[in-house]
Amino acid sequence: MNGEENSDSIPIDLILEILSRLPAKSITRFHCVSKLWGSMLCRPYFNELFLTISSARPRLLFAFSKHGEWRFFSSPQPQNPYGKSSFVATADFHTKFSQNLNICNYTSGLVYFSAMWITKADVICNPSTGHYAMLPKLLLTYGETRSFFLFDPVGKQFKVLLMNKINNNETKDIHILTLGTRKVRWRKIQQCPLIHIVSHEWICINGALYYIAYNIDDFLGYIVCFDVRSEKFKCLNLNQDCFSERSTKLIYYKGKLGVVNLKYAHGGGFPLKLCMWVLEDVEKQEWTTSVYTLRDEDRVVKVYYDLFIVGITATGEIVLAKKKVCKPFYVFYFNLERNTLLSVEIQGFGEYQSCCSVHAFVDHVEDLNVYAFVEHMKKTYEYDATSISPSEQKL
């Protein structure tokens, strides 16, 4: 029975309801069943239905690299796990991506890979299907680059912000690439008034990029804010204690920017102290400070300075994970309101249970609109193959 015959016996709305509960990778395959199915699965109604259901079951996305190949897994985030102190979850394999690139960041369901050096192109990848699109190269003649993959929720546009660094890691030139236009071209923009070194810690919140930076003169830490829509920079002061610990992470907590870091007990194990600063007033730059103690009550899990802060979930749980894949591999969920720590053993990584570095992202949601954007980039964009070097461009 072909797709057209099947649709006569089963209402289309019911078909869409059933399909909306499948993984995005399966939806991609079903586009090929027939023209009718391809048309149904492209409807805005179905895309929104799929996103609604996917948003109700956010997942923790993992990325591992081994021998030049990236593999993506995800596991369900605990839903109302109170009363438990530990349990086991199984990671689902999504896809592999054979490119020898450095992972850069994750935005709105897409993973952005940065080649880091001027001889290679950057890549945007769909972690559910492995489909990807390459970005046009910026013809720079020197140095290393630092990139940020950003999203403007008002203009519904993805942008890439690229900073060129000179020998002392000082930011020299800044360019931006707007995706979603017919012709994709790099533009040079005004630099931040603070001459600074860019760290690897950042977050994009409601169309604003925040990243930790260090003043080139006194090496004091700041938070630089970049408005994705207006493409303007400003700097925020912050208590220097935020930068003194082993692990520092920017988070989005109750609609506000936050900074968290860890302080280990003697010997590197539990209990851990988690310090959090929250920006209560942006204009006045007023921060509040909280300190929490994380305890592993069962004393089953052993950690020795090998945890990193993945982020904070939409339900307000700080997520910690081990820096290397090992067996057993644990993820920890600390609930700030209840002051409880949940230990989750993640199984199912297979051959990757051998000390690969871990990249993890909270609240991963599959979005068909975003995934279609990658395919649109590959098929219809006209890339500017002769992007202008800094010496030729004007502000």
Swiss-Prot record:
Taxonomic source organism: Arabidopsis thaliana (Mouse-ear cress)
Where in the numbering of this chain does the F-box domain appear?
4-53
Q: Which Pfam families match?
A: F-box, FBA_3
Q: What is the lineage of its organism?
A: Eukaryota, Viridiplantae, Streptophyta, Embryophyta, Tracheophyta
What is the protein name stated in its UniProt record? Putative F-box protein At5g42430
Q: Which InterPro entries match?
A: F-box-assoc_dom_typ3, F-box-assoc_interact_dom, F-box-like_dom_sf, F-box_dom
Top-level taxon of origin: Eukaryota
